């Protein structure tokens, strides 16, 4: 174990040394000395030296405004380098990869050893695998794209340096390259100057596809195929690609007025353009590779006399011409030119697939399987995974926008006000109109801008090539009419196919009512006819946790899923649950394997569809090798959950969860909603107000410009508490509820739940991880520097609560200390704390200076503001998650 860490530690210290030299070259010895002193004090403070902790606080308080930025940047950049070293460690032969035998192989062996599972059953489960990852542009990816590229290169250098047989000359060249990259990063501004537009966000998503997924997906499938051959003697069919990517970038307009119908249209075109660009590179390679002459009669008939000399090349060159014509047309459309569609325009995946597959079959039949299974197979798999649209997009809009649009329409038509009708009247009207042959929208009607936007979006969906839009997600869905309304608006736009429409249930009440809503919908004959036995439902993690606290929210999510699975099974409907979880614990994030196995039995039968948010995209898919490992983890977890589902929880366990849910929700809301001191405390003890200044995502931080916690989006709410290290949303209420149930004499039951019920043990594991990242002395320091003395008792109360919570969680889990069974994560947190602590202390100091200046009516010092932004980004890197 320790040898593993020593490889990581030596890389971290080597990168730190190079950064130190860079700082010295740029700013001189005295700044480096200052940074070194702070680092040593922080290390000693972490080891429990109180005198050094005091000295650390004093040193950072006494920095001049000129020293603030270099010190903040030094620690922030160091954390980015530490994260890069850790990312490399997870795929390096000396690191985690060495002690972590192949996930898929391990899963297959485990399944083979179950007497009740035949090899045929396992094969069928593999063939029904379905994994859809939905990339979202959450404003949590703080790191700029240019810096991400540099870190990818640093990673490549670390990989080459690991080679034992490397010559001295090469070693020196690599070290020089590392120094260049770290110097480039140091001299680059790490904070974006402007908020990204939705199109910028979409381009960020395409960059992930190009730099990592394009290579990672075929590599993952080779890995999967190899393991299946080895363990089951079974080859994957060529057309079998269980993974798809969808994006919310450019499609998610919920609370983001910057995403309009025009933007969505533009992003759809841009996505297709990027696909032609990437496939052209692939086809270019195949043109030079496939110089073979021998071919089957079928292939020769396909190419005719003209192509008989080099049939494979002939087909590839034809495909290349079509791709080039398609790309030119898309480019003109992106510039706003209206052109007729050229002949041979590629709009469907089959048009890409057919010529490639014809080559594949012919090569196989002529005994050239080794060639067929090379680059050609990778390209075929990319056609299945990415295809003509590259990534499909989801459209997401809030339910009230559809209700308002229909209200405006019914008032114009003089048939009443849809908005004020009862649910029964709304449903009757919607079903009547959905069955009607005549259009509902009058020709000469001039709706308001808001309604026009909703109708235009439906128009974009109707006109887009089928298959480029994956689903229409309705946020804040509450009733059956919310779903029917969208179907009616799409029908009016002239959509020619049944678009999957997914209600998103995201508050505690909505989760509790989700099953009733879906049961009513499935009882409508028209609706059953439309969906053809398939239904998608999205479960919201972040908003339910913000509404009720993590314990109550996670139980409501579990029960909603459980009930929906049973309802759909009874009705013969294939249900896909779409999980909207975030990167941080308060937004439902958890290590993938544990999270999936902790869901109700049967929840992955319809495949897994899950959002991958902001900063997590980089941690899980930032490099092709990491993509392979993330996709393998998901694959193993889905197979295991479907073939060896967790047991149904005992009735007594469900009753305990009901109890925990009620108590924890009361405690959570008692503070967050009912304590009059809470909002002023939150505003002053965290950088919540300053966060609004960070040019992160294209979406505003608040749903409504004024208002308390409930109007804040879930992300800034969690981000703010992560910054001051109290991590409040991820634990408040949970420990108090556990303590109460222990006092009622049920500790043995809780211990049994922890042992035998993955759902419950995952909850406790996530609490432990949060507590390991939280730091009470830092949270207290924020109070002392920033909070009015009258509010200090509330801060103290919350910190005491956390201390009590830690004790009760450890007692139930039977652990002597936090993260006892995940030493690798504990090690990683400790490694980073030494560098994150000074950033926290500095941030409290900067907030103090910035607010002081504001109080005195002075203009804020730009050096203070800039350094503050850097500490926010640095702490986010140190915590490995933002909001």
Swiss-Prot record:
Organism name: Escherichia coli O1:K1 / APEC
Gene Ontology BP annotations: carbon fixation; oxaloacetate metabolic process; tricarboxylic acid cycle
The protein, known as: Phosphoenolpyruvate carboxylase
Designated gene of the protein: ppc
Residues at the catalytic site: 138, 546
Function according to Swiss-Prot or TrEMBL: Forms oxaloacetate, a four-carbon dicarboxylic acid source for the tricarboxylic acid cycle.
InterPro entries recorded: PEP_COase, PEP_COase_bac/pln-type, PEP_COase_Lys_AS, PEPCASE_His_AS, Pyrv/PenolPyrv_kinase-like_dom
Listed GO MF terms: magnesium ion binding; phosphoenolpyruvate carboxylase activity
TM spans (from-to): none
Catalytic activity, reaction form: oxaloacetate + phosphate = phosphoenolpyruvate + hydrogencarbonate
The family this protein is said to belong to: Belongs to the PEPCase type 1 family.
UniProt-listed Gene3D superfamilies: Phosphoenolpyruvate/pyruvate domain
Keywords: Carbon dioxide fixation, Lyase, Magnesium
GO cellular component: cytosol
């Amino acid at each position: 174990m320790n040898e593993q860490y020593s490889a990581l530690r030596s890389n971290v210290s080597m990168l730190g040394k190079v950064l130190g030299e860079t700082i010295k070259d740029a700013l001189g010895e005295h700044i480096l000395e200052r940074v070194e002193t702070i680092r040593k004090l922080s290390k000693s403070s972490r080891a429990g030296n109180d005198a050094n902790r005091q000295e650390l606080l004093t040193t950072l308080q006494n920095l001049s405004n000129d020293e603030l930025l270099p010190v903040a940047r030094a620690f922030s950049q160091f954390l980015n380098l530490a994260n890069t070293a850790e990312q490399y460690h997870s795929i390096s032969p000396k690191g985690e990869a060495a002690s972590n035998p192949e996930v898929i192989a391990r899963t297959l062996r485990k399944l083979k050893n179950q007497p009740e599972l035949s090899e045929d059953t396992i094969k069928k489960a593999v063939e029904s695998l379905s994994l859809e990852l939905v990339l979202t542009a959450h404003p949590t990816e703080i790191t700029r794209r240019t810096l991400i590229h540099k870190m990818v290169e640093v990673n490549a250098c670390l990989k080459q340096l690991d080679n034992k047989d490397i010559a001295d000359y090469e070693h020196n060249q690599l070290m020089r390259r590392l120094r260049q990259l770290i110097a480039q990063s140091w001299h680059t501004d790490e904070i974006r100057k402007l908020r990204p537009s939705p199109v910028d966000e979409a381009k960020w998503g395409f960059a992930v596809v190009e730099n990592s997924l394009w290579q990672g997906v075929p590599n993952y499938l080779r890995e999967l195929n190899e393991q299946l051959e080895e363990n089951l003697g079974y080859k994957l069919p060529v057309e079998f690609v269980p993974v798809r990517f969808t994006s919310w970038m450019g499609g998610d307009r919920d609370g983001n007025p910057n995403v309009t119908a025009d933007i969505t249209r533009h992003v759809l075109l841009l996505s297709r353009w990027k696909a032609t660009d990437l496939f052209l590179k692939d086809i270019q390679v195949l043109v030079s590779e496939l110089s073979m002459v021998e071919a089957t009669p079928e292939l020769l008939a396909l190419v005719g006399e003209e192509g008989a000399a080099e049939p494979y090349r002939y087909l590839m060159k034809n495909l290349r011409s079509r791709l080039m014509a398609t790309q030119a047309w898309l480019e003109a459309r992106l510039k706003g030119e209206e052109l007729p569609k050229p002949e041979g325009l590629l709009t469907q995946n089959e048009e890409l697939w057919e010529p490639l597959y014809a080559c594949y079959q012919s090569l196989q039949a002529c005994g050239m399987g080794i060639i067929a299974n090379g680059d050609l197979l990778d390209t075929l798999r990319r056609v299945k995974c990415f295809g003509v649209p590259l990534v499909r997009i989801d459209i997401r809009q809030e339910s009230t926008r559809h209700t308002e649009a229909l209200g405006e329409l019914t008032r114009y038509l003089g048939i009443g006000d849809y908005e004020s009708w009862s649910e029964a009247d709304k449903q009757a009207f919607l079903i009547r109109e959905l069955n009607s042959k005549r259009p509902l929208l009058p020709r000469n009607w001039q709706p308001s801008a808001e309604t026009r936007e909703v109708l235009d979006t439906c128009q974009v969906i109707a006109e887009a090539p089928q298959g480029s839009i994956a689903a229409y997600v309705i946020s804040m869905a509450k009733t059956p009419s919310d779903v029917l309304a969208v179907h009616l608006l799409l029908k009016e736009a002239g959509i020619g196919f049944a678009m999957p429409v997914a209600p998103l249930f995201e508050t505690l009440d909505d989760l509790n009512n989700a099953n009733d809503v879906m049961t009513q919908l499935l009882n409508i004959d028209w609706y059953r006819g439309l969906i053809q036995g398939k239904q998608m439902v999205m479960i919201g993690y972040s908003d339910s946790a913000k509404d009720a606290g993590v314990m109550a929210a996670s139980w409501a999510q579990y029960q909603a899923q459980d009930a929906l699975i049973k309802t759909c099974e009874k009705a013969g409907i294939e249900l896909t649950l779409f999980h909207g979880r975030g990167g941080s614990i308060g937004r439902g994030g958890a290590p993938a394997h544990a999270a999936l196995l902790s869901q109700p039995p049967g929840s992955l039968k319809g495949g897994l569809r899950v959002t991958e948010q902001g900063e997590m995209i980089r941690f899980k898919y930032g490099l092709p090798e990491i993509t392979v490992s993330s996709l393998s983890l998901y694959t193993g977890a889905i197979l295991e959950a479907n073939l060896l589902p967790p047991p149904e929880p005992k009735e007594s366990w469900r009753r305990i969860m009901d109890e925990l849910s009620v108590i924890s929700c009361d405690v959570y809301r008692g503070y967050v909603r009912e304590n009059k001191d809470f909002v002023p405390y939150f505003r002053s003890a965290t950088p919540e107000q300053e966060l609004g200044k960070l040019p992160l995502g294209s979406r505003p931080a608040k749903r409504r410009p004024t208002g308390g916690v409930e109007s804040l989006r879930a992300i800034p709410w969690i981000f703010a508490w992560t910054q001051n290290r109290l991590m409040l949303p991820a634990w408040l209420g949970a420990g108090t509820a556990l303590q109460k149930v222990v006092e009622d004499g049920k500790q043995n039951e809780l211990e049994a739940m922890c042992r035998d019920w993955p759902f419950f043990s995952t909850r406790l594991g996530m609490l432990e991880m949060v507590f390991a990242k939280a730091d009470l002395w830092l949270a207290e320091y924020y109070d002392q520097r920033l909070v009015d003395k009258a509010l200090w008792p509330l801060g103290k109360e919350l910190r005491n609560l956390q201390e009590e919570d830690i004790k009760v969680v450890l007692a139930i889990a039977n652990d002597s200390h936090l993260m006892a069974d995940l030493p690798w994560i504990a090690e990683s947190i400790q490694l980073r704390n030494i560098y994150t602590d000074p950033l926290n202390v500095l941030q409290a100091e900067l907030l103090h200076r910035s607010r002081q200046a504001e109080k005195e009516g002075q203009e804020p010092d730009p050096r203070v503001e800039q350094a503050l932004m850097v500490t926010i980004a640095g702490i986010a890197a140190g915590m490995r998650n933002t909001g």
